[in-house]
Amino acid sequence: MLRALSRLLSTTTASVHLPIVPEKVVDHAYTTKNYKWMPGFSFPAPRSLEQVVKLALLEREPPARIREIWNEHHAPRLDSVATVWGGEEVAALAERRRRCPRFVYPVLKGDGKFFNLIAEWQDKFCIFSYLDDYRKDPSRAEPYLSVALYDDLLARTGLVLVRGDFSGHLTKRDAAHVLNLMRHFYFVEPKWVETFNKEPAAFDFSAFVAAVPRPPEKTDAAAGKVLF
């Protein structure tokens, strides 16, 4: 693993920080007023779904309406992205993340420039940190993005609500694309995740970057629905 990280750090990258100025967030009847903007944070994602929504109200709704409410709540927010996954997807992810808890994600900034995030799963949360900082000291690396899986409604609806909270180092479009890259490489094209964790010496970073799906010009970043 360390050899794979060392090779990544020797790759030419460019880091572009684009802070975002928060706008007023529209209230929703089923959501809490727990709005916060964090240019830097120790743990960005709410630990429980009840910190985000009024769960007692939301759980009464049918699955289709739950999707709508979840996406409507996050659409105007400039500190988080969200999507909804099915239970089968999350079950497959649970097994793979246990065997392959870490992976690297290039954040593409155009003109061939990018910087790398290293992601590490901790139970139902995935923390994304700047790779250079992580390599120096993982315990002190600042999180740029944290993805949380909320499975409170899984048994009744078959849905898992997914939310990614990000710092001012990322734009909303960046965060939405990284969230979808995570889904792509853990569900659709897992060979890169498997190689990175199990055979790090064989991980070809240049080939990997060439294989990374590029974000479309127009992204439904509010709901985190970039489809490859």
Where are these predicted regions, by residue range?
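The feature represents the first ordered module of a protein
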Residues: D79-D152, L161
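Charged, surface-exposed interaction regions in soluble eukaryotic proteins
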Residues: I127-H184, V193-K198
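Alpha-helical oligomerization segments
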Residues: T171-F228
